[in-house]
């Protein structure tokens, strides 16, 4: 709540995770369970292809409502059945599907992993048996520099905890690192291509030089008897 009240914060969601076996009828698959709040989908900019997100009441009641991603839909509902309203088993917890989010492309490209989203209160109590939130996702307002907001968040948490027992990750910084790495790899590949062209050119030149050297005597005889350059 303290984070949500900050002027630079546009949205906040707790986040807890667990890996379980998901089951629907006779289909089983490894599934990542994400425990989040009702604001998570706005914070991450996720859109729904069908159904809807859970609400504050679901959080308070530890409801077994689940939102699934497109990969989960394709894995468990291969016959085209509408997932909304169906019940899947996540570990030992039966959960009713209330929404399906649109396919998302991450900074690292497309992923085949299955992700489902339940109220964080449900995941903590029914799956993990814990009371501590492992991480918090914060969306910063567009008009605020992300680096400055990151420092302000860290200072706020250190002040409230009395010690620096947390760390932050900035999505903008990660994106910039990936872009820089991609640019470096592009330059490296271009340099390798140039070197290959130079080596190839030297090889062709050497072959031509050897050919001319081997025919020096023949060329001299032809020129002596009046051969033109075009004849040679």
Predicted ranges, named:
Residues 21, 85-89, 167:
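Residue-level detector of beta-strand face positions
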Residues 39-54, 64-161:
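Mid-to-C-terminal secondary-structure elements
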Residues 203-232:
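Interfacial "coupling" helices/loops that link adjacent transmembrane helices in transporter permeases
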Residues 83, 185-210:
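Internal alpha-helical transmembrane segments of multipass membrane proteins
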Residues 145, 150-153, 159-193:
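Peri-transmembrane interface segments
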Residues 1-32, 39-42, 75, 124-125, ...:
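Hydrophobic, regular-secondary-structure patches
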């Amino acid at each position: 709540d303290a984070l949500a009240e900050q002027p630079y914060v546009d949205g906040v969601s707790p986040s807890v995770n667990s890996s379980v076996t998901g089951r629907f009828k006779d289909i089983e698959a490894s599934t990542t369970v994400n425990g989040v709040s009702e604001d998570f989908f706005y914070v991450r900019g996720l859109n729904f292809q069908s159904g809807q997100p859970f609400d504050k009441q679901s959080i308070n009641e530890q409801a077994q409502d689940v939102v699934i991603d497109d990969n989960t839909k394709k894995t468990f509902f291969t016959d085209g059945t509408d997932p909304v309203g169906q019940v899947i088993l996540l570990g030992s917890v039966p959960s009713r599907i209330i929404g399906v989010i649109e396919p998302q492309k991450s900074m690292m490209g497309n992923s085949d992993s299955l992700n489902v989203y339940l109220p964080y209160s449900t995941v903590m109590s029914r799956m993990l048996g814990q009371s501590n939130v492992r991480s918090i996702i914060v969306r910063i307002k567009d008009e605020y520099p992300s680096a400055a907001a990151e420092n302000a968040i860290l200072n706020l948490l250190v002040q409230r905890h009395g010690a620096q027992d947390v760390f932050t990750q900035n999505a903008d910084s990660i994106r910039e690192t990936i872009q820089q790495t991609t640019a470096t790899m592009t330059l490296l590949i271009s340099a390798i291509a140039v070197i290959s062209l130079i080596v190839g050119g030297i090889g062709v030149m050497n072959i031509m030089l050897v050919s001319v050297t081997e025919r020096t005597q023949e060329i001299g005889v032809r020129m002596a008897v009046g051969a033109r350059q075009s004849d040679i």
